[in-house]
Design a protein with these regions (language model features):
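Catalytic cores of extracellular degradative/oxidative enzymes
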Residues: 1-108, 113-119
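Residue-level detector of solvent-exposed, low-hydrophobicity positions
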Residues: 8, 107, 123, 167-169, ...
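Generic structural signal of hydrophobic/aromatic residues within well-ordered alpha-helices
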Residues: 71, 76, 80, 119, ...
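Gly/Ser/Thr/Ala-enriched C-terminal appendages of enzymes
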Residues: 91, 95, 99-142, 146, ...
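Beta/coil-rich, acidic/histidine-enriched accessory regions frequently appended to metallopeptidases
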Residues: 133-188
């Protein structure tokens, strides 16, 4: 945001009553998303934090697309990194939902209220994380999330296209090869 935008967004009454907190929360989310910021979701994984801010101030709880969009992507066997079928476009409105669905289940429903703090800690403690190819990071996320949850979350992540083999170049903030193989899926 430019300095002139601060007057529009920063007065507390406007942030809360007019739902203007999404933009600042989205930008601050970029500071916290490191462990879940992989190619194809740079502009959506940070919205876990935006959705949380909306929840905390009592506003609507998600800006994400309806889950019927997810069902369509699954029906068409699209991998998570390329739900739109265009390697230059991120499906931000549905991508943000995966992180929020996990929060709703584990935190809001009280299943495991330390799920995200523990998951982020485990991801942060992997000092090699940023050097791991993006497809491997995706599968590591599945493994770590399942470990922290003490549940096999493979079916959940399969619905979200994590368990769909893919080998393509994604053009988002640079060019990155995104590879998830059947062998990687089987290992997870």
């Amino acid at each position: 945001f430019g300095i002139n935008a601060l007057d529009e967004f920063m007065p507390t009454e406007k942030l809360y009553t007019e739902r203007r907190c999404w933009g600042p929360a989205h930008e601050i989310g970029h500071l916290h998303q490191g462990a879940i910021a992989w190619t194809g979701c740079f502009e959506s994984s940070n919205n876990l934090f935006s959705n949380y801010v909306l929840y905390k101030i009592g506003r609507e709880c998600s800006n994400g697309a309806p889950l019927s969009v997810l069902a369509d992507r699954k029906l068409n066997n699209r991998p998570f990194c390329n739900f739109l079928g265009d390697p230059k476009k991120e499906d931000t409105e549905i991508h943000m939902r995966i992180y929020w669905q996990l929060w709703l289940y584990f935190h809001r429903c009280g299943i495991k209220s330390d799920f995200y703090p523990e998951l982020f800690k485990k991801l942060r403690n992997n000092r090699n994380l940023n050097n791991i190819p993006v497809g491997e990071r995706q599968m590591l996320f599945v493994k770590y999330a399942s470990d922290i949850a003490q549940k096999n979350l493979a079916d959940f992540f399969d619905m979200w296209g994590f368990m769909t083999p893919v080998d393509e170049t994604i053009e988002q903030y640079g060019s990155n090869r995104y590879t998830v193989t059947n062998a990687m899926i089987a290992e997870t």
